[in-house]
Amino acid sequence: AVQLLEVNPEIAQNS
């Protein structure tokens, strides 16, 4: 699940 979040640009921006 975390991997998918990293792939998403929106979530990646949150990191």
Swiss-Prot record:
GO terms for cellular component: extracellular region. Expressed by the venom gland. The keyword Secreted applies. It is found in: Secreted. Keywords: Neurotoxin, Secreted, Toxin. The keyword Transmembrane does not apply. GO terms for molecular function: toxin activity. Belongs to the scolopendra toxin 9 family. This is Scolopendra 10564.33 Da toxin. It comes from Scolopendra viridicornis nigra (Brazilian giant centipede).
